[in-house]
Amino acid sequence: MAKTIYASMKMKVQTNPKEIDFNGNKIEILQYLPIEDKYDLVMVTLQKSLEDGVYNPIKKDMYFHLYLVYMYTDITFTDKQKEDESKLYDVLESNGLITEVIKNIPEEEYNKLFEYMNELMDL
């Protein structure tokens, strides 16, 4: 059997951004997040939601979805906007942006992040 050389396959990570229109703004949403970025998203979510040895489910939900927006979209936020993440979350959630981002990420990709997070919480 002939061997195929990996380098000759010229592959790279396929994030395949999908463009959506949200309130007249074009937003790109990645369809695949590289594994290191998935790890970072899950770990930051867990670290920020841990209170006295217990994961606060409200904060876990908030940070998970905020970091989903930060990492899967091309939306940029200033440091000042990120200072009050609860307020930022409320603005994004109440205006439907988080729902739109979730709808436009492949279900398998979204579910895999939850699996990783739940598995790490059980350790």
Residue spans for each PLM region:
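N-terminal "first-domain core" detector
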Residues: 2-48
